[in-house]
Regions:
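Conserved AMP-binding A3 loop
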Residues: 4-8, 141-167
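ANL superfamily adenylate-forming
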Residues: 86-137, 247-276
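Conserved pre-ATP/AMP-binding loop-to-beta segment of ANL
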Residues: 124-145, 152, 178-185
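Conserved AMP-binding/adenylation subdomain of ANL enzymes
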Residues: 164-188, 192-272, 281, 306
Length: 528
């Protein structure tokens, strides 16, 4: 049973909430925190914060109590919205008793928040704000603490100019195939504090019109997606992998290949797959937040789903390059620079540098890091790559991810991990091996892999590893493939909130076993 708010109801509630916030006597440009899974109140609170002239500071809803306490202090947060979370019992004990809180209505399956002003009780005290704050483009819009794959989160300061400039992309290029008359259905399920969800889903919907639906829970995601059939769908590579493996679990690859060769049947199969995924009406399907293997893009293309590959980060408001899913020539790139973006490569380090109106003002209360990242107007992305003769950008890895073997050779993990993209028996692969003579690969099995007899699986993976190694220079050859026991999740900190592998945490979890694995004569091992 879906509950609906009209645009008028949403605007009325946001204006009342803005009036309430202004009545609290907060300092000018006060920092207002938000911690909640995606829901309508999140959007309304975000709008109200802007209308009141304050700065939003959203947090990942998966934060632990100590992490949130640190960010509330460091981010100088004056008031906190608490909503759809499952961890209030542990978080609440870390927040001072007198800290101002406004709590969203309780959602099924979430912990009851027992402190602060209740949402409707607070809002209904006020009349709608007549004259919302109108910011200057140079004003600070938001501070987003990145999840990061190493170290403490950094508070990225984005101005209204950065947000406003994103309209250039939609209006001039329209990679999302947005209908400017407002016929757009969006689904929101990736964390709203993540820059892509906020810009691509929330603000594109607000700017150009449409409806925005929220997934109830992870368990209901697949059904909700089928119900909504959005016009625009964005997913991290891990979600695309889940979709792919789900299809192959029902229709094995050989059978699928055969069916796709039959003209009439091929069209029916593609139509059915899209419907079952929830992508029948999708005008654009986009991947981002982490690298997607070219083999996966090509696989989806064969079943009629054309994935646009986008490259960006919080520091540039998710705007840098993109390659359309129908651009067959450059599937292994992340595309050409977007309108208003300049990209170049540092000749010494091969680091990707970019500039444009979308770039952050800096890192909150971290002048040293700001100066190291923003140099003469150029954002140093931390990614390594190159531009081809047609100005298409290719990402080869992270500057900080490179590691040196005991032979003194540097390894770029991402370039090796991409070789495993066609192996459907594996769900996730991480190349590592600092200090070993050769790199090793850690992997977790997919449901397809788990269904195979152990000896058959080992034999198959030994063949695949040998095939991969024939394409590699000697120093890059992978000595061992280890199938890990524990599932990699956000809970055990191997994956971040945006489903990227946190390599530092992988090192912490497994590094003591590296030497033994490498010295084992077998090339495919199960972790004991």
């Amino acid at each position: 049973q879906w509950e609906e708010y009209t645009w008028a109801e949403t605007g009325q509630m946001a204006r009342k909430l803005a009036a309430g916030l202004k009545s609290l006597g907060l300092r000018d440009n006060a920092h207002i925190g938000l911690i909640s899974k995606n829901c309508r109140e999140w959007i309304i609170a975000d709008l109200a914060i802007m209308m009141a002239g304050y700065v939003s500071v959203p947090f990942f809803p998966s934060l632990k109590g100590e992490e949130l306490k640190y960010l509330l202090d460091f981010g100088d947060v004056d008031l906190l919205f608490v909503g759809k979370i499952e961890t209030w019992d542990s978080i609440g004990t870390r927040i001072p008793e007198d800290f101002p809180i406004i709590r969203f209505p309780q959602y099924k399956g979430c912990t009851a928040v027992d402190r602060g002003e209740q949402w409707f009780d607070f809002i209904n005290q006020f009349q709608p704000l007549i004259k919302p704050h109108v910011p200057k483009l140079s004003d600070l819009w938001t501070i987003i603490f990145t999840s990061g794959t190493t170290g403490n989160p950094k508070g990225v300061e984005l101005s209204y100019l950065a947000l406003d400039s994103t309209k250039i992309i939609t209006e001039q290029v329209n990679p999302l195939k947005v209908d400017f008359s407002g016929n757009n259905d969006f689904i929101s399920y990736l964390p709203l504090n993540h820059i892509v969800e906020r810009v691509v889903v929330e603000h594109v919907c607000m700017r150009f019109g449409g409806s925005l639906s929220f997934v109830e829970s992870i368990d209901s995601f697949a059904q909700n997606l089928k119900d909504i059939q959005p016009h625009v769908f964005f997913a991290a590579p891990r979600i695309w992998t889940k979709f792919q493996l789900g299809i192959l679990a029902k229709v094995p690859q050989k059978k699928l290949d055969l069916l796709l060769k039959i003209p009439v049947i091929s069209g029916l199969i593609k139509k059915k797959l899209k419907k079952n995924l929830g992508l029948t009406r999708a005008r654009s399907t986009v991947s981002g937040s982490a690298p997607i293997p070219v083999a996966q893009i090509e696989w989806f293309r064969k079943v009629g789903i054309y994935i646009t590959n986008g490259y960006g980060m919080t520091e540039n408001c998710a705007i840098c390059t993109q390659v359309d899913g129908r651009d067959f020539r450059k599937s292994d790139s992340v595309g050409k620079p977007q309108c208003g973006v300049d990209v170049k490569i540092d000749p010494k380090t091969q680091e990707v540098l970019m500039r444009g109106p979308f770039v952050m003002d800096g890192y909150y209360k971290n002048e040293k890091m700001t100066k190291a990242t923003l140099i003469n107007g150029w954002l140093h992305t931390g990614d390594k790559g190159y531009l081809d003769k047609d100005n298409y950008l290719y990402i080869t890895g992270r500057v900080v991810d490179s590691f040196k073997t005991s032979k003194g050779k540097f390894i770029e993990p991402l370039s090796l991990e991409n070789y495993f993209g066609t192996i459907k028996e594996l769900e996730e692969v991480c190349i590592t091996g600092l200090g070993l003579p050769q790199p090793i690969a850690l992997a977790q099995l997919s449901e397809i892999g788990k269904a195979l007899p152990k000896e058959e699986l080992i034999g198959f993976l030994e063949e695949k590893l040998a095939e991969i190694n024939t394409d590699l220079a000697n120093y890059k050859k992978i000595s061992t493939l280890i199938l890990v026991k524990e599932q990699w999740t956000e809970q055990n900190k191997v994956l971040g909130p945006t489903l990227k592998i946190k390599r530092g945490n992988v090192e912490e979890m497994y590094s003591k076993k590296y030497k033994g694995w490498h010295e084992d004569r077998r090339t495919v091992l199960f972790e004991k």
